[in-house]
């Protein structure tokens, strides 16, 4: 066990404007994920573009937003889907992990959303959750669906640059956020319902080996969700249901606790700002984007 780490406070960077909220509206997603409850939005998938705009998704209502550096919100797409994760490719294309429709791509010129990978080998995914680009353009993504300790059948995939698809891992109880370490030899995988972050060593050919637990977490109403790495190799882990983002060293030691100033549903994170030391956090209970100043800059992501 470790002593409690120092606390880093947050502030609200921006809140979804009321004109975009859908109060008391139900969807298929809210019926299952919120046990019949309602939500006027549920934010996830933060990712910055080259101009400093923060892109993010609204899962239950199939919307993609971008927020300017001064906090102005724009709805870039509204479609029949459940977008859960979002990442930018180096060429500026936007890829979406959609719980309902698979891996999608957003056309920035038209706002159209189209399939990039929806039925590999004629089979649907369980429900894609999050995604990550390696330096060479390889796309890793998680297929979570409704898996958990009762149904440990979630999967981790790799989409190679030659369009070949590999199943890297299966038998995972709720795979969620993912990111590699600095040299990309280790993949960190948030396993939400196990309340743990797994360490997945990757062989030169891309196969996983000797998978183990990197950090065993506790508490909260959900578990580890989105993650990001800084230039020192420290791992920021959004702990959904605890109102916290944990910062762990490359050895798994807790360095800091970033505390939400809003609700407890801290779902995902992205580094940004002029010096890339600002950690932006989607807080889905209040529909807000929080920000905290971190000790190290975030690693520049692919794209």
Where are these regions (language model features)?
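Beta-propeller fold detector
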Residues: 10-17, 74-78, 114-118, 166-170, ...
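Short, solvent-exposed loop/turn segments at conserved positions within beta-propeller repeat blades
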Residues: 59-60, 99, 147-154, 192-195, ...
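Beta-strand-rich domains and repeat architectures in extracellular enzymes and scaffolds
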Residues: 12-63
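Loop/turn-rich, solvent-exposed surfaces of beta-rich toroidal or solenoidal domains
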Residues: 195-196, 200, 208-211, 215-253
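Sequence/structural signature of beta-propeller modules
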Residues: 1-28, 291-303
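A short loop-to-beta-strand structural motif that recurs across blades of beta-propeller domains
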Residues: 63-65, 102-104, 155-157, 196-198, ...
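Beta-rich, blade/repeat-based domains predominating
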Residues: 33-51, 79-102, 121-139, 146-147, ...
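Short loop/turn segments that connect beta-strands within beta-propeller blades
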Residues: 67-72, 107-111, 159-163, 201-206, ...
């Amino acid at each position: 066990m470790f002593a409690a780490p120092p606390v880093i406070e947050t502030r609200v960077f921006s809140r979804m404007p009321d004109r975009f909220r859908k109060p008391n509206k139900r969807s298929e997603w809210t019926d299952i994920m919120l046990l019949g409850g309602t939500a006027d939005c549920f934010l996830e998938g933060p990712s910055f573009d080259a101009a400093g705009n923060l892109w993010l998704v609204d899962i239950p209502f199939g919307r993609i937003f971008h927020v300017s550096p001064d906090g102005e919100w724009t709805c870039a797409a509204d479609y029949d889907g459940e977008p859960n994760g979002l990442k930018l490719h180096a060429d500026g294309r936007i890829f979406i992990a959609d719980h309902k429709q698979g891996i999608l791509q957003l056309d920035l010129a038209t706002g159209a959303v189209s399939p990039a990978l929806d039925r590999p080998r004629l089979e649907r995914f369980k429900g894609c959750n999050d995604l990550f680009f390696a330096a060479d353009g390889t796309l890793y993504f998680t297929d979570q669906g409704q898996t958990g300790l009762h149904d440990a059948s979630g999967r981790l995939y790799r989409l190679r640059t030659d369009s070949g698809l590999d199943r890297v891992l299966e038998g995972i109880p709720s795979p969620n956020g993912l990111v590699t370490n600095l040299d990309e030899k280790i993949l960190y995988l948030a396993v939400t319902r196990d309340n743990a972050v797994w360490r997945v060593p990757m062989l030169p050919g891309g196969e996983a080996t000797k998978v183990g637990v990197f950090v065993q977490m506790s508490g909260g109403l959900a578990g580890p969700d989105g993650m990001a790495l800084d230039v020192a190799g420290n791992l920021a882990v959004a702990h959904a249901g605890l109102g916290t983002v944990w910062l762990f060293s490359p050895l798994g030691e807790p360095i800091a606790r970033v505390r939400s100033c809003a609700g407890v549903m801290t779902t995902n994170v992205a580094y940004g700002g002029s010096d890339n030391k600002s950690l932006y956090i989607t807080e889905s209970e209040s529909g807000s984007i929080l920000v905290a100043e971190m000790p190290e800059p975030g690693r520049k992501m692919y794209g």
